[in-house]
């Protein structure tokens, strides 16, 4: 019998009931050929990996900086899903406890979940040790928690801001477990524009109103240039006696105030 005639015969493994397929022969197409081709049992060739079908683009602008009167925290309120604006009223500053604030940049669900979990861990720490957790310890807790999931698709870039026995504290933590202490940070797609304003106007000796104006101006400039940032500017001030919410200004109103300004 010729070899060609053997290869042309249909494979019996695709009959109804074999391997519990119930007649779905298409489920056992192991190779590049059709199920009736004898070559269908050959190992599949290595091809080009399939590209992700959906690419979610993250966009936001958040900032925080330390100065002699505490820590200023500001953020926009726009949430995007790819090229679509999902919301204009997202609260991107998370109130962890009366002395700690966190910001959201990256995946909204990731940031919200991990910072709310951090709030519970901070409360447990206080109950066990009978004292407030420090800003450094809180940021280290968050970094340790997310590091366990490194490489698993988390998307988070947050700033932990607060006041403890050492004074004002500011740390940047991301989903890779990185943790950095600093005086000024801006995170998000509009951060390059916010940094431009902060680098020019920031000083540790700023007065309170000057610091408020600098934060508003920095977020406004980011929303003006970055399509993924917008909505309103939420402004917080962390002081020795706890944080306060200073204001929430629509960027359209800030445009009337700052457009044409040269500084």
Swiss-Prot record:
EC number from the UniProt entry: 3.4.25.1
Coiled-coil ranges from the UniProt annotation: none
A Pfam family of this chain: Proteasome
Catalytic activity: Cleavage of peptide bonds with very broad specificity
GO cellular component: centrosome; cytosol; nucleoplasm; nucleus; proteasome core complex; proteasome core complex, beta-subunit complex
Annotated localization: Cytoplasm; Nucleus
Record GO biological process: proteasome-mediated ubiquitin-dependent protein catabolic process; response to oxidative stress
Molecular function as annotated in GO: endopeptidase activity; threonine-type endopeptidase activity
Keywords: Cytoplasm, Hydrolase, Nucleus, Protease, Proteasome, Threonine protease, Zymogen
Binding partners and assembly: The 26S proteasome consists of a 20S proteasome core and two 19S regulatory subunits. The 20S proteasome core is a barrel-shaped complex made of 28 subunits that are arranged in four stacked rings. The two outer rings are each formed by seven alpha subunits, and the two inner rings are formed by seven beta subunits. The proteolytic activity is exerted by three beta-subunits PSMB5, PSMB6 and PSMB7. Directly interacts with POMP. Interacts with ABCB1 and TAP1.
Family: Belongs to the peptidase T1B family.
Role according to the record: Component of the 20S core proteasome complex involved in the proteolytic degradation of most intracellular proteins. This complex plays numerous essential roles within the cell by associating with different regulatory particles. Associated with two 19S regulatory particles, forms the 26S proteasome and thus participates in the ATP-dependent degradation of ubiquitinated proteins.
Name recorded for this polypeptide: Proteasome subunit beta type-5
Gene coding for it: PSMB5
């Amino acid at each position: 019998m010729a070899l060609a005639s053997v290869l042309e015969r249909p494979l019996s493994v695709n009959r109804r009931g074999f391997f519990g397929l119930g007649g779905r022969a298409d489920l056992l197409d192991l190779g590049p050929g059709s199920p009736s081709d004898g070559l269908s049992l050959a190992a599949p060739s290595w091809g080009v990996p399939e590209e992700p079908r959906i690419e979610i683009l993250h966009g936001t602008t958040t900032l925080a900086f330390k100065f002699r009167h505490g820590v200023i925290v500001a953020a926009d309120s726009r949430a995007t899903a790819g090229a679509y604006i999902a919301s204009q009223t997202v609260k991107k500053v998370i109130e962890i406890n009366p002395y700690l604030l966190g910001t959201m940049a990256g995946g909204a669900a990731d940031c919200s979940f991990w910072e709310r979990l951090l709030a519970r861990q901070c409360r447990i720490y206080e109950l066990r040790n009978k004292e407030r957790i420090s800003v450094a310890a809180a940021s280290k807790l968050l970094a340790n928690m997310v590091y366990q999931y490194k490489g698993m698709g988390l998307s988070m870039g947050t700033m932990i801001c607060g006041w403890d026995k050492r004074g004002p504290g500011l740390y940047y933590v991301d989903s890779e477990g990185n943790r950095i202490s600093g005086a000024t940070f801006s995170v998000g797609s509009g951060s390059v524009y916010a940094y431009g304003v902060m680098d020019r106007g920031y000083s540790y000796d700023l007065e309170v109103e000057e610091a408020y104006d600098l934060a508003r101006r920095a977020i406004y400039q980011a929303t003006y240039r970055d399509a993924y940032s917008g909505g309103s500017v939420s402004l917080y001030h962390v002081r020795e006696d706890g944080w306060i919410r200073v204001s929430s200004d629509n960027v359209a109103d800030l445009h009337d105030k700052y457009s044409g300004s040269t500084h």
